[in-house]
Design a protein with these regions (language model features):
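N-terminal Rossmann-like dinucleotide-binding module
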Residues: 1-56
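C-terminal helix-rich "cap/oligomerization" subdomain common to oxidoreductases
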Residues: 1-11, 76-81, 283-286, 312-353
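Predominantly a Rossmann-like dinucleotide-binding segment in NAD(P)-dependent oxidoreductases
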Residues: 126, 133-220, 229, 346
Length: 353
């Protein structure tokens, strides 16, 4: 890998593992990062592998990712596989000195996630969790406006409402991600963790949480409906009101653009995010005004895969820390676990510093 501050024109050599539904967004994003060349990928399903080759022109496919590591000697690996596989793959990459970007959920449990992060730290490799929601352009713009004092010097509340509509009926989740049906934990583990991380990004440290979780669709194993309450160190309150069963007030493909509607209130006004990505600012006593900022429908959800992978690339090139490093993401996962504990005990749970 080119050293920090290097003027070398050599591209970073990357490899990917996985060829499922979501991996296509990540393969496409890598093709738009000029400092990166994906030299090979690994997948054991020949049909899915053929799809990746046909769509992205990647002709080197390995059934064994360890052989790929040893043969290609990449600078980094992008792990786009189900959570139970992450620990073994990360360990093999770390012991070879390969930098890692790994999809979330990071592992099947917080304990396993801690071991994954510790392995990478001992090996001295950079480790980033591919947590892309905070990189969605509307959340970056909302963060900028909060920091600029657009809604005052005190944050009052954050309230996000999500209705995804892909989880009702006997065939729920089968078209895209059928394994969701068998997750014993679903809504918070798979989707809510995005918003836990985003709320931390926007409002800072979380000190206490309360959660109510339930299952609306009897054909799945995990929860698909929840109300999550956050208390922040700065005095603000947060709420995530979500279910994957009911539908939003827009065509279903549109629901996966912003994943819902957002209201952020402060001492001098409020910000609103709409389903189409529009942001408005309303000062106290004033009219609602549209905020002009760039966002588009390329890639996934505002092109957040590209933006997250661009961030990882920049961190590799400059040796700067990743926003969603392993150590930082463990804090998000601890809050996730606290949400499940709260739902189980039917009471608030304090977040230890």
């Amino acid at each position: 890998m080119p050293p920090s501050g290097s003027t070398s024109s050599r591209k970073l050599r990357g490899v990917c593992i996985g060829a499922g539904y979501f991996s296509h967004f990540q393969y496409e994003a890598w093709q738009r990062i000029p400092e990166v060349e994906i030299v090979a990928f690994s997948n054991r399903d020949p049909v899915k592998a053929a799809e990746i080759t046909a769509k992205f022109g990647l002709t080197k496919c390995y059934a064994d990712y360890r052989e790929m590591f040893d043969t290609e000697k990449p600078d980094f690996v992008d792990i786009i596989t189900p959570p139970p596989s992450h620990q073994a793959i990360c360990a093999e990459a770390a012991k070879r000195g390969i930098q890692i970007i790994c999809q979330k959920p990071l592992g099947p449990s917080l304990a396993v996630a801690k071991e994954i992060v510790a392995d990478a730290a001992r090996a001295g490799v950079k480790f980033m969790v591919h947590e892309n929601f905070r990189f969605q352009p509307w959340h970056r713009e909302i963060k900028r406006l909060i920091q600029a004092g657009a809604i005052g010097d005190r944050l009052h509340s954050l309230a996000f409402r999500s209705r995804m509509g892909d989880g009702w009926g006997e065939n729920a989740y089968i078209p895209r991600q059928p394994y969701f049906r068998d997750y014993p934990r679903l809504l918070v583990y798979e989707t809510g963790v995005h918003f836990i991380d985003t709320f931390r990004y926007l409002a800072g440290d979380i000190t206490r949480v309360t959660a109510w979780l339930r299952r609306l669709n009897p054909v799945i194993k995990g929860e698909d409906c929840g109300l999550l309450i956050f208390e922040f160190a700065n005095g603000a309150l947060g709420q995530w009101d979500a279910n994957r069963y009911n539908e939003p007030a827009c065509p279903l493909p549109e629901a996966r653009y912003t994943f819902g509607e957002f209201l952020v209130e402060g001492s001098a006004g409020s910000l609103r995010l709409y389903l189409d990505g529009r942001i408005t600012l309303k000062k106290l006593g004033g009219e609602e005004q549209t905020v002009d900022y760039p966002h588009g429908r390329r890639g996934f959800a505002g092109d957040c895969c590209y933006l997250a992978q661009r961030h990882f690339t920049d961190c590799l090139l400059t040796n700067q820390p990743c926003e969603t490093s392993g150590e930082e993401y463990l804090k998000t996962m601890a809050i996730q676990e606290a949400m499940y504990a709260s739902a189980s005990t039917r009471g608030p749970v304090d977040i230890l510093p």
